[in-house]
C-alpha cells in the first residue's frame, strides 16, 4: 500500500485489472527511477471466478501482505527503522517538495521501498542518497525525528557500515560481514559447526535445518531463535495465521483446508517436520483452481544457503495455457531417461511432477515487488524424489514485462543482434521459447536427477543457489533443441530453439552486465549461473569457433556459428553440474562459479553499459499489486 502511494500511484482494483483487456489507454509502465521500472499487471480471468473463489483469494492476499515486515527485518536488522523514517518524512514534510534535493531524497526512498531495504536487491551493495546528509538530517528534524538523527544518519550515509546485504567482497567473514539478519555475532565456522552437530547424514528425510530461525551467539552460547507465533516475528506471523484461518473457512475443498491447517500449525510451533508435512500435502493438490505459496521458502539471501526469506504468492490456474505444461509434465520420465547425465544420478521413477501456467493475484515478501517468472517447489530433495514437485509459469507477470518493454521506443534486440537475420529470428520465436524455457527449467530442470545416498543437501553451501539455477537452466537449454518438443506440439519447428540459444548466450556473456556497476563482480545467483554457462561454453568451444566474438562499427557481438555443437556443450556441462550436485562436490562447484561466473571483462563491461545507456532503458523491473 505504502509503496504504491509513494510512487504517486493508485493501484487498479482487481475488477479494473481484469477489465483492462479492453482498455486501450492502460499503461503497464507506471514509474521509472534510478535503474528501476515499476510495472502494473492485469489479472485476466478474474471475472470467471465465482464469489467464494474471490473471497478465498482475498484472505490469502491479506495473509500475503502481513508478512512484509518479516522480510524487511530479515534483510537488515535496522530495515524497519529506515522505512518508518522515510515514511514519516514523506507523510509529514511540508517544505518545498519541488526542490532538487527533495526529489533526490524521494528517489532514494523509492529505491529503499523497491529493494525492501538499504541494499540493492540484486547487486547486494548499500546505496547512498544523492542528497547530502545535512539535508536529510534537516528533513528528519522538520518531521519530528530529531532524536533519531544521530543513529539514523550513519546507517544511511556511512559507506563503511553495513556495506553488503550478503558479503560478496571475498574479504572478511562471510557471515560477520553480511548485513542480512539471519545470524547475530556468529562466524561462518561457528554456524557450519553448529549445524553439522545437529544434522543426521543418515536421515533419508531430513528437515531443512535452520530454514526458519536466526542463529545467535550470546555469552558464548550459540542457539536458534525460531520464527513462530510466540517467537521471532510473532506479531506478523499471528496476522498471517489469522487470515490463513479465514481463508480456510472459504477454501475450495477439504484438501486445501487440511494443508492450511498444517501450515498454521507450523507457524504456531516452528516445527520443521510439520513444514515438511505441509509441503507433502500441498504438492499432492493438483486439482484445485486456486493455489498459494506462503512461508519461509527460498534461501538465496543467506550467505550459507540455509535460512529462508518469507514470501507469498496467490494465484489461480490459467486453464488454457496449462495444456502446454501438462504435456511436459506427462512426459517427465522420458526427459529424465534421455538426459545426458550419468545413470547413477537419474531418478528411476519420476514421481508427481505437476506443471501449470498461473495468473498471479497478489505478490508478497521476497516476491514483491520483484517477482519470479517461474517457480518450482518444494525445495527439499527427498520430497521431490518421493512425492514430486509443483512447477508454475507465471503468465500475467511475463506478459506485463513484455508489454512494458513494448511501451519503450528502443529495445535491446536490435542493438545487440549481429544482423537482421538474428533480429527476425528473435522477434519470431523469442516469446515462445522464453516461455518454454521457463516451463522446462521449473517443471523438469529443478526436479531432475537425485542425490547419491549420504550426500548432504547442503554440501554445496554458498554455491548451491547459482549451481542449482545453472543446472535447471542448462537442462532446459539442452532439451529446447530436441525434436521431441516439435513431436509433442509445444515447439513450432526446429528453427525456434535457435532464438533461445542466441538470447541466452548473448545475455549470459554480455548484456546482463548492464545491471552491474563497472568494476564490480557478478553476485546474484541466477546471473552467476547464466554467466557461468555462457562463458564455459564460449571457452570450451573456442577451438571450433562454436561461439564467435565479432566486431562491427566499433561494437562487440557474440555470434553462434554451430548450434548443434553448442547443444553438445550444454549436454556436457549439464552432466557435470548434475554430478556436482549428486556427489556434493563443493570444490568443483566452487571452481565453476569462481572461474566462469563472477569476473567481468572490464572493456566489455564498459561497452555494454555505454550502449545500454543510449537506449534509455531500466534494467530492473518490479510490480504494483492490484487492490483486492
What do these predicted regions represent?
Residues 9-13:
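C-terminal motif of bacterial Sec signal peptides marking the signal peptidase cleavage site
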Residues 106-217, 224-422, 430:
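Contiguous, non-catalytic segments that form substrate-binding/exosite surfaces or channel walls
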Residues 431-444:
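Short alpha-helix carrying the canonical HExxH Zn2+-binding catalytic motif
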Residues 443-455, 479, 483:
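Catalytic Zn2+-binding segment of zinc metalloproteases
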Residues 449-470:
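Post-HEXXH active-site segment of zinc metalloproteases
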